[in-house]
């Protein structure tokens, strides 16, 4: 268990189990938006660089999708505000722009045309380019979720420096929580 501190004040605690959830909860394609994940954190998690867009803004809506289908199929599953992981296919990049995705993660340092970049800028779409392949980017993207999303913030059991060890032991035995 590790304390999460801001300006000298305890905000919460995080456990190995909490961290493991970021790897286990892979079936929730909305998790990045639920966690209000910042685009610069996404770029860091995939070892990427922000090509255009506000890296300080957040993914607030939308799901994470991989553009691996035909444009017709992609038009059916990509929605406005989604984060789309893709490769070098120009039609996939254009589809993400046309569907007004909030973010495009372009893998394997694939080229992005100036026209796509201009359209993305106009629609305030963040474009991140990464050297990682699509599989690796998709695996690592959950590592961008802020600690505050997984940490325990309530029902914390705390002690002060002047508390006696015997009292701490008794308290630990009487409570079943790991929120210390």
Where are the regions a protein language model picked out?
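Helix-loop-beta junctions that constitute the ligand-sensing/allosteric loops
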Residues: 1-20, 81-82, 100-103, 166-180
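Arginine residue identity/basic-tract feature
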Residues: 6, 36, 40, 44, ...
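Residues that cap or initiate secondary-structure elements
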Residues: 20, 90, 110, 163-165
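Feature captures the catalytic cores and cofactor-binding loops of soluble hydro-lyases/lyases
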Residues: 66-154
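Active-site/ligand-binding-proximal alpha/beta "capping" segment
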Residues: 72-73, 77-78, 92-94, 159-178
